[in-house]
Amino acid sequence: MSAVTLQQGDLLLNLYIQPKASRDQIVGLHGDELKVAITAPPIDGKANAHLSKYLAKTFKVPKSDIHIMKGELGRHKQIRVIDPKIIPSVITELMGQTS
């Protein structure tokens, strides 16, 4: 499965999360996954909450439109973004589109 898939208007992202990074950013491909660095530590769900907030801001959607489908407790996650308003260029490039 690819790192980024568009499915019925939603984005499916296969992510590799790097917690406790110096800043929040989409790093790029990491094998078959998209690497995302976040500043939050992987303690008591803080990294998941921070990731949801960061992705909501990045895709200009409410946090309720970010769903962790798989990987709640690990670094490897599958995320569904419901009807993203903006898709960053790093992701459109992976989808084979031009921004």
From Swiss-Prot:
SUPFAM superfamilies linked: YggU-like
Which InterPro entries does the UniProt entry name for this protein? DUF167, YggU-like_sf
GO cellular component assignments: cytoplasm
Question: What Pfam families has UniProt attached to this entry?
Answer: DUF167
The UniProt entry, under HAMAP family, shows: UPF0235
Q: Which family does it belong to?
A: Belongs to the UPF0235 family.
Name it.
Answer: UPF0235 protein Sbal223_1335
According to its UniProt entry, this protein's organism is Shewanella baltica (strain OS223)
Traced from the root, the source organism's taxonomic lineage reads:
Bacteria, Pseudomonadati, Pseudomonadota, Gammaproteobacteria, Alteromonadales
